[in-house]
Amino acid sequence: KNKCQLPSDVGKGKASFTRYFYNEESGKCETFIYGGMGGNSNNFLTKEACCRECAQGSC
């Protein structure tokens, strides 16, 4: 699977980082809370990075 098709994944850890993931259903980059370790590659620090990688102009 392409990383943009993966679901958001909180991962492991006790941190609460706000990150962005591409939601294939809505076609948008949305926020989720990341635990700080693990997870998957559909995890971006900024909305801009998510849009550039996955949303192809829909942001």
From Swiss-Prot:
Q: What else is known?
A: Negative results: has no effect on chymotrypsin and elastase. Shows weak inhibitory activity against mKv1.3/KCNA3 potassium channel (inhibits 50% of currents at 1 uM).
Expression sites (tissue/organ): Expressed by the venom gland.
Checking Pfam families in the record gives:
Kunitz_BPTI
What keywords is this UniProt entry annotated with? Disulfide bond, Ion channel impairing toxin, Potassium channel impairing toxin, Protease inhibitor, Secreted, Serine protease inhibitor, Toxin, Voltage-gated potassium channel impairing toxin
At the top level, the lineage of the source is Eukaryota
Of the GO CC terms on this record, one is: extracellular space
Which family does the record claim for this protein? Belongs to the venom Kunitz-type family. Scorpion delta-Ktx subfamily. Delta-Ktx 2 sub-subfamily.
Q: Report the protein name in the record.
A: Kunitz-type serine protease inhibitor LmKTT-1c
Keyword RNA-binding attached = no
Residues carrying the site annotation Interacts directly with the S1 pocket of trypsin: 14
Which residue pairs form cystines in this protein? 4-54, 29-50, 51-59
Q: Which InterPro entries match?
A: Kunitz_BPTI, Kunitz_BPTI_sf, TFPI/VKTCI-like
What biological function has been recorded for the protein in this entry? Serine protease inhibitor that inhibits trypsin at a molar ratio of 1:1 (Ki=124 nM).
* Biological classification of the source: Eukaryota, Metazoa, Ecdysozoa, Arthropoda, Chelicerata
Where is this protein localized, as stated in its record? Secreted
- GO terms assigned for molecular function: potassium channel regulator activity; serine-type endopeptidase inhibitor activity; toxin activity
Protein's GO biological process: envenomation resulting in negative regulation of voltage-gated potassium channel activity in another organism
Give the BPTI/Kunitz inhibitor domain ranges.
Answer: 4-54
